[in-house]
Regions:
Chain B
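ABC ATPase "signature
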Residues: 217-218
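A short, proline-enriched helix->beta-strand linker immediately N-terminal to the Walker B motif
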Residues: 151-155
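Helical segment within the ABC ATPase nucleotide-binding domain
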Residues: 172-185
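Catalytic Walker B motif of ABC-type/P-loop ATPase nucleotide-binding domains
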Residues: 157-161
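Conserved H-loop
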Residues: 186-194
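Conserved ABC transporter NBD signature motif
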Residues: 64-72, 79-80
């Protein structure tokens, strides 16, 4: 129950941030996507994930800055709440917000294709939705881990440039796959969706455990 | 305003040890009997805040035990904190929340949260429920901390310099409330302060810390008895901690 209360608190604190962020992302994405010629398949979809990746980062930054700015983790620690509960709640609220953010962008993609605004591939499948969401959760979890382990939302800016590398990889994944001979591995993961999703979730759970352990063993909490 | 205490437990601190940079807190031991008001005295940097934060688990100890009514502060963290109310010198709240929102956020964590008492305390301390915490003065934020610390009717109240930097009116209001919870509710109190007048006014016992060690632990009544009419806490303190 404590986890739910902590998540509810974060959702309340972020309510004025999430809607403008999503509106900005949707309009920003549409402004670019509608200019992309339809004969370049996959670019608009790559761009969609690029926008969502920056959204993942901003969501993490916002949820962490709410604690950092007010040094509120110090206050939370005085309540009858365990350290793992604090960490799980932080990951939980991010999973919810990133799910909502990516979900809206994917719905925009699906709707766009359905109504003929966007003509390029791919069509939205369950596989694409699941893999897309999982990758965004992983991306966001990476930033939360950095922020919690170093007890500072400022720390998340250090790996921020890596986001652009990830976006470039997404946009050029077909070529990268060929050059690095990753086809068999990617094919396997594509065939065994559950294995792929399971692997990513194992990493996310690993991040949660690592953060709980680090915070528990830190000299000063927060 | 009916302030009651949920249990009569004694707080025991046993050989508490911690290192923070080049500062060492060395073998801090004391026990506070139920209903007793104990003042933690010492110069700046003596280890008062560190001791309180160690008890609350905000700072990790190197060695030692802290228990309240048989609950260890690390092993039984939740049960331990259910029985404690803590007021920090600086109130680290979410500044965007209103006072009422903060109370609503904190209340579900405590099994014994008393909504009626919380409302009464807000009223008695003249706190505006709809005001954002970021817009409150330091004194008001300390009062909010006190409301949060008292509304679950803890058996022990830990206060880190609760009246420091407050105007005389806020200071008097807070001391009045403290007297009420100790005398009427029988709550055990451990508070750190630099104000010797406050100690003389409300404490039963004092613990003097110096450079991370307990220098003295005395009952004020015994000291007054020993010294007679010439009793002066300031002289006693300065003789011990030059």
């Amino acid at each position: 129950m404590n986890i739910i209360h902590l998540i509810a608190k974060d959702l309340r604190l972020q309510r004025n941030f999430v809607l403008p962020l999503m509106l900005l992302e949707v309009t920003g994405y549409l402004a670019y996507a509608l200019q992309i010629p339809s004969h370049i398949p996959g670019v608009a979809f790559g761009l969609l994930h690029g926008v969502a990746l920056i959204g993942d980062f901003l969501i993490c930054h916002r949820t962490m800055i709410a604690e950092e700015k007010n040094r509120a983790l110090m206050f939370i620690k005085t309540l009858p709440v365990s350290t793992p509960e604090i960490v799980i709640a932080k990951f939980g609220v991010n999973i919810l917000l990133v799910g909502l953010n990516t979900g809206i962008l994917l719905a925009l993609w699906g709707g766009g294709r359905e109504f003929g605004w966007i003509e390029v591939a791919p069509s939205l499948t369950t596989h694409l939705v699941l893999v897309g969401l999982t990758m965004h959760w992983l991306n966001n979890a990476f930033f939360i881990t950095i922020s919690l382990v170093f007890s500072s939302e400022h720390a998340v800016w250090v790996p921020f440039p890596a986001l652009f590398v990830v976006i470039t990889v997404i946009l050029n994944f077909k070529q990268i796959k060929i050059v690095l001979h990753l086809e068999p591995f990617v094919d396997l993961l594509q065939r065994r969706e559950a294995l792929f999703v399971g692997l990513i979730w194992a990493i996310i759970v690993g991040f949660v455990v690592m953060c709980s352990w680090t915070l528990k063993h830190k000299r000063i909490f927060a | 305003m009916g302030v009651t205490s949920i249990a009569q437990d004694s707080l025991t601190v046993d050989r508490l040890r911690a290192r923070l940079g080049d500062f060492w807190l060395n073998d801090i031991s004391f026990s506070i009997a139920p209903g007793q008001v104990t003042a933690l005295l010492g110069h700046n940097g003596a280890g008062k805040t560190t001791t309180l934060r160690l008890i609350m688990g905000i700072i990790r100890k190197d060695f030692g035990h802290v228990s309240l009514g048989g609950f260890d502060h690390v092993r039984d963290e939740k049960e331990f904190k259910q029985r404690i109310g803590f007021v920090q010198e600086e109130s680290f709240f979410y500044k965007g929340m209103t006072v009422r929102e903060l109370c609503a956020f904190v209340s579900p964590f405590y099994g014994a949260w008393n909504k009626g008492l919380s409302r009464q305390l807000l009223q008695a301390l003249d706190l505006p429920g709809d005001k954002k915490l970021g817009h409150l003065s330091k004194g008001m934020r300390t009062k909010v901390s006190l409301v949060l610390a008292l509304s679950h009717e803890p058996s022990v109240l830990l206060l880190d310099e609760p009246t420091s930097g407050l105007d005389p009116r806020a200071r008097v209001e807070i001391l009045k409330l403290l007297r009420k919870v100790t005398h009427e509710g029988g709550t055990t109190v451990l508070f750190s302060t630099h104000n010797l007048h406050e100690v003389d006014e409300i404490a039963d016992r004092l613990i003097i810390l110096d450079r991370g060690r307990v220098l003295a632990e005395e009952s004020l009544a015994a000291l007054r008895c020993k010294t007679g009419p010439s009793w002066n806490l300031e002289h006693y303190y300065l003789a011990l901690v030059p």
